[in-house]
UniProtKB/Swiss-Prot annotation:
GO molecular function terms noted in the UniProt entry: L-lactate dehydrogenase activity
Signal peptide start-end: none
GO cellular component, one term: cytosol
Further information: The E.coli ykgEFG operon is a clear homolog of the B.subtilis lutABC operon, however it is not able of restoring L-lactate utilization to the B.subtilis mutant for lutABC operon. Thus, ykgEFG operon may contribute to lactate catabolism in E.coli, but under conditions other than those tested, or alternatively, the ykgEFG operon may be responsible for the catabolism of a metabolite other than (but perhaps related to) lactate in E.coli.
Transmembrane portions of the chain: none
Coiled-coil features, chain-numbered ranges: none
Entry similarity comment: Belongs to the LutC/YkgG family.
Top-level taxonomy: Bacteria, Pseudomonadati, Pseudomonadota, Gammaproteobacteria, Enterobacterales
One Pfam match: LUD_dom
Name used for this protein in its record: Uncharacterized protein YkgG
Amino acid sequence: MDNRGEFLNNVAQALGRPLRLEPQAEDAPLNNYANERLTQLNQQQRCDAFIQFASDVMLTRCELTSEAKAAEAAIRLCKELGDQSVVISGDTRLEELGISERLQQECNAVVWDPAKGAENISQAEQAKVGVVYAEYGLTESGGVVLFSAAERGRSLSLLPEYSLFILRKSTILPRVAQLAEKLHQKAQAGERMPSCINIISGPSSTADIELIKVVGVHGPVKAVYLIIEDC
């Protein structure tokens, strides 16, 4: 017996079992929670659970609206939060909902323009409210998912004091596993991946110091979800 065999034999004896030279199949997992948790919920139940978690745990304000009333709801919320300075993502989906145009009319909002370069960041830094379109909501965490692009800068949801996220009810997913699957499908289809994928769960929240909870140390002080009931 060579040194390797002798060593392995000693290990096997210490474990109280015969020497194994071939790998053993792993036991079947007891569950598949990583992929299946919350998938039993229908879309309405997902939305209800999403709102409850976001409101109770993340201290995020949630409102429901229709496509037809989305623009007026966005105006009202921006005015409540502080319409003296509003920046909007250059996302065409906000334009299609009429939100971009109405906020420019009513709140003198500025639209993120890639051609302006660093000026966009300065405007976002001085803004009271940033308005962005969320790709998905995650029921488990109460967070929203943002895909960055030239017309959708990361500063829009980071620098303003308040963030208003426009989210469609139909895009609320059970958890991050389903988000990963959608990204995988995009990659398999040859679609270009976003430069940055942000999962935002409302304002920052920490209780590191003496277990005293402090909200809004970084990121938006307050987040608002405007959920469009499209299903």
